Regions:
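C-terminal end-helix/capping segment
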Residues: 116-137
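Generic structural signal for secondary-structure transition and capping sites
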Residues: 11, 38, 78-85, 110, ...
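GST-like domain detector, emphasizing the conserved glutathione-binding G-site
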Residues: 1-63
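Short, hydrophobic secondary-structure boundary micro-motifs
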Residues: 13-18, 85-89, 114-115, 135-139
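GST superfamily/GST-like fold recognition
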Residues: 86-110, 128
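Non-transmembrane alpha-helical segments in soluble domains
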Residues: 3, 7, 27-30, 73, ...
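Short helix-capping/linker segments at secondary-structure and domain boundaries
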Residues: 48-52, 105-114
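Amphipathic alpha-helical packing segments from all-alpha helical-bundle domains
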Residues: 61-80
Length: 140
């Protein structure tokens, strides 16, 4: 909601198309990235929750969530195909959402080797990392 409000304040450089098919596509990509983040966060919480003993942790739950992460990565890779951006020919909220999701995987799940599995996502992520807005906000 915040990004949608902020997007209305600028007459140029819209991150979300105002109407039509492209708007639906951007929102679909955003939902896909959000789903990846939801599943990865659930897996992370289950694996690291301080209030639980190892016996109380559910590896099956973690595996289920990571399966969702991998399914989302496959869907993103298929949707991106050989395009430069997720939707259209310019940066949109779709690209930002995907870039943030991939960055979170790098930060919390370095064992997920999405770069070698999905070179087109790697290419998009590298392009996004050339932007100061991405490069300056990488977690330390």
């Amino acid at each position: 909601m915040i990004v949608e409000y902020l997007d209305t304040l600028s007459p140029v450089g819209k991150l979300i198309p105002s109407v039509g098919r492209e708007r639906a596509e951007v929102k679909t990509w955003e939902a896909l990235a959000d789903g990846l983040l939801d599943a990865s966060l659930l897996a992370r919480l289950e694996a690291t929750w301080a209030g639980r003993s190892d016996a109380e942790r559910s590896q099956a739950w973690i595996d289920r969530q990571l399966g969702k992460v991998h399914a989302a990565l496959r869907a993103m890779s298929q949707g991106l195909a050989d395009k430069s951006y997720c939707v259209g020919i310019h940066l949109s909220l779709a690209d930002i959402a995907v870039g943030c999701a991939l960055g979170y995987l790098d930060f919390r799940f370095p064992q997920i080797d999405w770069r070698s599995l999905y070179p087109n996502l790697t290419k998009l992520h590298e392009k996004l990392m050339q932007r100061a807005s991405f490069a300056d906000t990488v977690p330390a």
